[in-house]
Amino acid sequence: MKTKIMPKSHLGFNQLIEDIAGQYSGDKVETPITYTPAQWKARGEQYGLKSECIVIHDGGDYGPFFDLDHGHYEAHDFMQEELAKHGLWFETCTTWYSAIYKND
């Protein structure tokens, strides 16, 4: 499998996540709420600081893609598989946010 280009900016991560969710659902999805690790640290958060991006998914279109508690296993796996094509993976940190990391 050839790795696709990894996003180079915060807005690039937003667009990638939105595109993957839209591809799965076949509908337009809301723009994800994301933070850079620096923004996340400035909020006083402790986890996900070594990630590439933090995604907030509490009460929105993105919960089924990042939190298995929603029971949408296919959506969750689809997001993981599509991110992997860009050299990325995510970890669900809590039921309301996840961190996206580079594959090493």
Language model region names:
Residues P32, T92-D104:
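Ser/Thr-rich, low-complexity intrinsically disordered terminal regions
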Residues M1-P64:
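An N-terminal amphipathic alpha-helical segment
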Residues R43-C93:
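Acidic, low-complexity, intrinsically disordered interaction modules
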